[in-house]
Amino acid sequence: MTKVIKSKYKVSRRLGTSVWGHEKDAINNKNYKPGQQGNSSSISKPSDYSKHLIAKQRLKSHYGRISEKQFRNTFKIARKKSGNTAENLVGLLERRLDAVVYRLNIAPTIFAARQLVSHKHIKVNGKKINIASYRVKAGDSIELSEQAKQIPIVIGAISKKARRIPEYLAFDDEKFIGNFIRMPSSISEVPYPFDPQINLVVEFYSA
Protein backbone atom coordinates (compact mmCIF):
# COMPACT_ATOMS: atom_id res chain seq x y z
CA MET A 1 0.00 0.00 0.00
CA THR A 2 1.44 3.39 -0.98
CA LYS A 3 1.95 6.32 1.37
CA VAL A 4 -0.72 8.26 -0.54
CA ILE A 5 -3.35 5.57 0.02
CA LYS A 6 -2.39 5.26 3.69
CA SER A 7 -2.75 9.03 4.01
CA LYS A 8 -6.24 8.92 2.48
CA TYR A 9 -7.32 6.20 4.88
CA LYS A 10 -5.99 8.22 7.81
CA VAL A 11 -8.16 11.14 6.68
CA SER A 12 -11.27 8.95 6.88
CA ARG A 13 -10.29 7.67 10.33
CA ARG A 14 -9.55 11.19 11.57
CA LEU A 15 -12.91 12.45 10.30
CA GLY A 16 -14.83 9.42 11.55
CA THR A 17 -16.35 8.35 8.24
CA SER A 18 -15.43 6.88 4.87
CA VAL A 19 -14.99 10.16 3.01
CA TRP A 20 -14.78 8.54 -0.43
CA GLY A 21 -16.76 5.36 0.18
CA HIS A 22 -13.88 2.97 -0.49
CA GLU A 23 -14.53 -0.64 0.54
CA LYS A 24 -10.95 -1.04 1.80
CA ASP A 25 -11.11 2.14 3.86
CA ALA A 26 -9.61 1.52 7.31
CA ILE A 27 -12.56 3.26 8.97
CA ASN A 28 -14.64 0.17 8.18
CA ASN A 29 -12.47 -1.86 10.57
CA LYS A 30 -11.00 0.78 12.86
CA ASN A 31 -13.68 3.25 13.81
CA TYR A 32 -11.37 5.47 15.83
CA LYS A 33 -8.77 8.14 15.11
CA PRO A 34 -5.13 7.40 14.15
CA GLY A 35 -2.98 7.10 17.28
CA GLN A 36 -5.97 6.20 19.42
CA GLN A 37 -5.82 2.71 20.95
CA GLY A 38 -9.23 1.40 20.02
CA ASN A 39 -12.63 2.77 20.93
CA SER A 40 -12.74 4.33 24.37
CA SER A 41 -15.82 5.31 26.34
CA SER A 42 -13.74 7.97 28.09
CA ILE A 43 -13.35 10.05 24.94
CA SER A 44 -15.15 13.37 25.32
CA LYS A 45 -18.01 14.25 22.99
CA PRO A 46 -17.20 16.80 20.29
CA SER A 47 -18.20 20.41 20.89
CA ASP A 48 -20.56 22.25 18.54
CA TYR A 49 -17.55 23.93 16.96
CA SER A 50 -15.88 20.56 16.39
CA LYS A 51 -19.03 19.18 14.74
CA HIS A 52 -19.14 22.12 12.35
CA LEU A 53 -15.40 21.89 11.66
CA ILE A 54 -15.53 18.16 10.97
CA ALA A 55 -18.50 18.60 8.61
CA LYS A 56 -16.51 21.19 6.67
CA GLN A 57 -13.38 19.03 6.57
CA ARG A 58 -15.34 16.00 5.37
CA LEU A 59 -16.85 17.94 2.49
CA LYS A 60 -13.51 19.48 1.51
CA SER A 61 -11.83 16.07 1.64
CA HIS A 62 -14.55 14.43 -0.43
CA TYR A 63 -13.81 16.81 -3.27
CA GLY A 64 -10.11 16.01 -3.16
CA ARG A 65 -8.91 18.12 -0.27
CA ILE A 66 -9.72 21.46 -1.85
CA SER A 67 -7.66 24.27 -0.34
CA GLU A 68 -9.29 26.34 2.39
CA LYS A 69 -9.01 29.50 0.29
CA GLN A 70 -10.68 27.89 -2.72
CA PHE A 71 -13.39 26.29 -0.60
CA ARG A 72 -14.16 29.52 1.25
CA ASN A 73 -14.36 31.44 -2.04
CA THR A 74 -16.78 28.84 -3.37
CA PHE A 75 -18.94 29.34 -0.30
CA LYS A 76 -18.92 33.11 -0.80
CA ILE A 77 -20.20 32.66 -4.35
CA ALA A 78 -22.88 30.25 -3.11
CA ARG A 79 -24.03 32.73 -0.48
CA LYS A 80 -24.32 35.57 -3.00
CA LYS A 81 -26.46 33.51 -5.37
CA SER A 82 -30.23 33.56 -4.95
CA GLY A 83 -31.83 30.49 -3.40
CA ASN A 84 -30.66 28.08 -0.71
CA THR A 85 -26.99 28.56 0.18
CA ALA A 86 -26.46 24.88 1.03
CA GLU A 87 -27.84 23.72 -2.32
CA ASN A 88 -25.91 26.45 -4.13
CA LEU A 89 -22.68 25.28 -2.49
CA VAL A 90 -23.22 21.66 -3.49
CA GLY A 91 -24.18 22.73 -7.00
CA LEU A 92 -20.95 24.69 -7.41
CA LEU A 93 -18.86 21.81 -6.07
CA GLU A 94 -20.58 19.32 -8.38
CA ARG A 95 -19.84 21.57 -11.35
CA ARG A 96 -16.09 21.26 -10.80
CA LEU A 97 -14.58 19.41 -13.74
CA ASP A 98 -12.66 16.95 -11.57
CA ALA A 99 -15.86 16.18 -9.65
CA VAL A 100 -17.80 15.61 -12.88
CA VAL A 101 -15.12 13.23 -14.19
CA TYR A 102 -15.27 11.37 -10.86
CA ARG A 103 -19.08 11.21 -10.81
CA LEU A 104 -19.08 9.86 -14.37
CA ASN A 105 -16.89 7.02 -13.05
CA ILE A 106 -14.27 7.74 -15.66
CA ALA A 107 -11.73 7.60 -12.84
CA PRO A 108 -11.79 5.43 -9.69
CA THR A 109 -11.04 8.31 -7.30
CA ILE A 110 -11.39 12.09 -7.18
CA PHE A 111 -7.59 12.29 -7.15
CA ALA A 112 -7.28 10.18 -10.30
CA ALA A 113 -9.96 12.36 -11.90
CA ARG A 114 -7.93 15.46 -11.07
CA GLN A 115 -4.84 13.87 -12.63
CA LEU A 116 -6.74 13.20 -15.85
CA VAL A 117 -7.78 16.84 -15.98
CA SER A 118 -4.34 18.27 -15.13
CA HIS A 119 -2.68 16.03 -17.75
CA LYS A 120 -5.05 17.37 -20.44
CA HIS A 121 -6.89 14.10 -20.94
CA ILE A 122 -10.32 15.73 -20.65
CA LYS A 123 -12.15 17.84 -23.21
CA VAL A 124 -15.18 20.04 -22.52
CA ASN A 125 -17.21 20.71 -25.65
CA GLY A 126 -14.23 19.56 -27.71
CA LYS A 127 -11.69 21.81 -25.99
CA LYS A 128 -8.96 20.47 -23.70
CA ILE A 129 -9.31 21.81 -20.16
CA ASN A 130 -6.59 21.22 -17.55
CA ILE A 131 -8.11 23.20 -14.67
CA ALA A 132 -9.70 20.94 -12.04
CA SER A 133 -11.86 23.75 -10.64
CA TYR A 134 -13.26 24.65 -14.07
CA ARG A 135 -17.05 24.86 -13.75
CA VAL A 136 -19.05 22.98 -16.32
CA LYS A 137 -22.60 24.03 -17.09
CA ALA A 138 -25.80 22.31 -18.17
CA GLY A 139 -25.46 20.89 -21.66
CA ASP A 140 -21.67 20.61 -21.64
CA SER A 141 -20.09 17.45 -23.03
CA ILE A 142 -17.09 15.83 -21.34
CA GLU A 143 -14.86 13.70 -23.54
CA LEU A 144 -11.76 11.60 -22.96
CA SER A 145 -8.64 12.07 -25.06
CA GLU A 146 -7.64 9.15 -27.29
CA GLN A 147 -4.65 8.47 -25.04
CA ALA A 148 -6.82 8.40 -21.91
CA LYS A 149 -9.04 5.72 -23.43
CA GLN A 150 -6.06 3.35 -23.19
CA ILE A 151 -5.18 4.08 -19.56
CA PRO A 152 -5.79 0.94 -17.42
CA ILE A 153 -7.46 2.72 -14.48
CA VAL A 154 -9.83 4.47 -16.89
CA ILE A 155 -10.70 1.23 -18.65
CA GLY A 156 -11.18 -0.46 -15.29
CA ALA A 157 -13.41 2.29 -13.93
CA ILE A 158 -15.64 2.41 -17.00
CA SER A 159 -15.95 -1.39 -17.27
CA LYS A 160 -17.18 -1.83 -13.69
CA LYS A 161 -20.61 -3.48 -13.61
CA ALA A 162 -21.64 -1.66 -10.45
CA ARG A 163 -21.17 1.81 -11.94
CA ARG A 164 -23.65 4.31 -10.60
CA ILE A 165 -23.95 7.64 -12.37
CA PRO A 166 -26.17 10.40 -10.90
CA GLU A 167 -29.34 11.33 -12.77
CA TYR A 168 -27.97 14.77 -13.59
CA LEU A 169 -25.16 13.20 -15.65
CA ALA A 170 -25.00 10.77 -18.56
CA PHE A 171 -22.21 8.76 -20.17
CA ASP A 172 -21.93 6.93 -23.49
CA ASP A 173 -19.70 3.89 -22.88
CA GLU A 174 -19.06 3.39 -26.60
CA LYS A 175 -18.13 6.96 -27.48
CA PHE A 176 -16.49 7.71 -24.12
CA ILE A 177 -18.45 10.95 -23.91
CA GLY A 178 -20.30 12.23 -20.86
CA ASN A 179 -22.84 15.02 -20.46
CA PHE A 180 -23.62 17.38 -17.63
CA ILE A 181 -27.38 17.35 -18.16
CA ARG A 182 -28.43 19.65 -15.36
CA MET A 183 -27.69 20.81 -11.84
CA PRO A 184 -28.55 18.39 -9.01
CA SER A 185 -32.20 18.94 -8.11
CA SER A 186 -31.41 18.45 -4.42
CA ILE A 187 -28.51 17.60 -2.12
CA SER A 188 -29.93 14.10 -1.65
CA GLU A 189 -29.43 13.44 -5.37
CA VAL A 190 -25.65 13.71 -4.98
CA PRO A 191 -24.12 10.27 -4.15
CA TYR A 192 -22.21 11.18 -1.01
CA PRO A 193 -21.00 8.06 0.88
CA PHE A 194 -21.73 9.86 4.17
CA ASP A 195 -24.19 12.40 5.57
CA PRO A 196 -22.70 15.65 4.19
CA GLN A 197 -24.41 17.86 6.80
CA ILE A 198 -24.20 20.83 4.44
CA ASN A 199 -26.13 23.06 6.82
CA LEU A 200 -23.34 22.66 9.40
CA VAL A 201 -20.84 23.73 6.75
CA VAL A 202 -22.94 26.80 5.94
CA GLU A 203 -23.20 27.64 9.64
CA PHE A 204 -19.43 27.24 10.06
CA TYR A 205 -18.67 29.89 7.44
CA SER A 206 -21.56 32.11 8.50
CA ALA A 207 -20.43 32.34 12.13
Curated annotation (Swiss-Prot):
Residues 26-47 are annotated as: Disordered. Residues 95-158 form the S4 RNA-binding domain. GO terms for biological process: ribosomal small subunit biogenesis; translation. Belongs to the universal ribosomal protein uS4 family. The gene is rpsD. This is Small ribosomal subunit protein uS4. GO terms for molecular function: rRNA binding; structural constituent of ribosome. GO terms for cellular component: small ribosomal subunit. Pfam families: Ribosomal_S4, S4. One of the primary rRNA binding proteins, it binds directly to 16S rRNA where it nucleates assembly of the body of the 30S subunit. Residues 28-39 have a biased composition (Polar residues). Part of the 30S ribosomal subunit. Contacts protein S5. The interaction surface between S4 and S5 is involved in control of translational fidelity. SMART domains: Ribosomal_S4, S4. Keywords: Ribonucleoprotein, Ribosomal protein, RNA-binding, rRNA-binding. SUPFAM superfamilies: Alpha-L RNA-binding motif.
